[in-house]
A protein has these predicted regions:
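Long, low-complexity C-terminal extensions of enzymes
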Residues: 363-370
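Short, charged, low-complexity loops and linkers
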Residues: 5, 29, 292-301, 326-333
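Acidic, low-complexity proline/glycine-rich segments
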Residues: 14-26, 277-288, 304-316
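Generic structural signal for well-ordered, non-transmembrane alpha-helical segments
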Residues: 46, 50, 142-145, 308-311, ...
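Internal helix-loop-helix
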Residues: 57-151
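N-terminal-proximal low-complexity accessory segments that begin disordered
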Residues: 4-58
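Extended amphipathic alpha-helical segments enriched in small hydrophobics
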Residues: 301-360
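FAD-binding core of flavoproteins
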Residues: 153-302
Length: 370
């Protein structure tokens, strides 16, 4: 712990090694019909896991720490996008922190930890949206910010019985099975959980297009956060592009940046009350996306990542044109200029998102967090 002008500066952010160790927590991961014991060493996941570990290492590097991190209102150092931004200029700094992380994967990993930070930071700025579970929201904001936890999300019901009511799909769709003083037990299937196998926890909710029947489908109106090693939670992975890649030289992207997608099976999973954000509340479950601020924040992360990817593509294209001697052709330069213009457009859009934010002055901690 350090003191900066009498202000706390507590650093509990995971290192790369701590992140890799956190994946070997007893979680139930299955791929090709086999249960995986060591995620960080398995050939289907190890390179992508180590790509993420580089992001965590960068948070502690002296040359990049001040660019990527800051101290939140509680005195804990965290990634700038994991905390609410009190001004447009601070949000622009968060954009630059996103870009710095994204450059480590050339913009090709879309669901890095800062993606879900677009949501978790709002838990700190507007916890009362989740009343009577507002203390849970604050708890999870603090947990994710202090450790810079890697969350995935799982929102979609399996694509079966689409013509039937949600209540008639109880044997498949995720729902509350039992309630006790300690928490709830849930059962069912959710998809598609991108990078679930290499993340720390999953955020579970319903897709924004879900239509509930009031008085009949309250058991399905849920929103909670769950560690990936929760008992009876099974992670069923698609085939691994990383495992089938010959080498980083032959397959430079799929060999290192494969964000494996999973189906999550909740086979009687216990969820403590402190992990619950919405429970049997159709109105809140229905309005969560528009009310929480996540829809406002996540485009900044995804747009910044695309801008970084465009940097890479433009640079690669210029090298190709130089190598084959066509870089001086006027028609080729015109086409190249079109692509560079798209690159410039993306950077301009992300800057505009930061400096012309939505008015969120009703929130207790941030004028622009939503």
């Amino acid at each position: 712990m350090q003191m900066d002008n009498n202000r706390l500066d507590i650093n509990e952010m995971m290192t790369g090694r701590e992140y890799l160790d956190s994946l070997n927590d007893g979680r139930s991961v299955y791929i090709y019909g086999q249960k995986i014991k060591d995620v960080s060493r398995h050939p289907a996941f190890r390179n992508s896991a180590h790509s993420i570990s580089r992001l965590y290492e960068a948070l502690h590097h002296p040359e990049s720490q001040d660019l990527m991190t800051s101290v939140d209102r509680d005195g804990y150092r965290t990634h700038r996008y994991f905390m609410p931004s009190p001004s447009g200029n601070e949000l622009l700094k968060a954009r630059d922190a996103i870009a710095s992380w994204s450059r480590l994967t050339y913009g090709f990993m879309g669901r890095t930890p800062d993606y879900k930070a677009g949501f978790t930071a709002t838990l700190g700025s507007d916890p009362h949206l989740y009343a009577p579970f507002h203390e849970n929201a604050l708890h999870w904001y603090r947990q994710t910010a202090r450790k810079v936890l890697f969350l995935n999300h799982v929102l979609v019901n399996p694509p079966v019985g689409r013509s039937r009511a949600i209540a008639d799909m109880r044997d498949i769709y995720l729902h509350t099975e039992k309630e006790t003083d300690a928490g709830i037990t849930v059962r069912g299937v959710k998809m598609v959980a991108t990078s679930a196998v290499i993340s720390n926890a999953t955020f579970v909710a319903q897709n924004s297009a879900t239509q509930y029947q009031i008085g009949r489908e309250e058991d399905f109106a849920l929103c909670f956060i769950l560690p990936m090693n929760a008992p009876n939670l099974k992670i069923m992975c698609r085939r691994s592009y990383e495992a089938s890649a010959l080498s980083p030289f032959d397959n430079p992207l799929s060999s290192r940046f494969d964000e494996n997608d999973s189906v999550l099976i909740f086979d009687g999973v216990f969820v403590p009350w402190e992990n619950v954000l919405i429970y049997r509340d159709i109105e809140r479950a229905r309005n969560f996306y528009s009310a929480s601020g996540f829809l406002n924040r996540y485009p900044l992360q995804s747009g910044t990542r695309l801008a970084v990817k465009m940097d890479f593509i433009c640079g690669l294209l210029i090298k190709v044109l130089e190598s084959n001697g066509t870089d001086s052709f006027r028609s080729v330069r015109t086409r190249l200029a079109d692509i560079v213009a798209l690159r410039n457009l993306m950077w301009s859009l992300t800057e505009s998102l930061c400096l012309n934010p939505s008015d969120c002055t009703h929130l207790e901690d941030s004028a622009v967090s939503c």
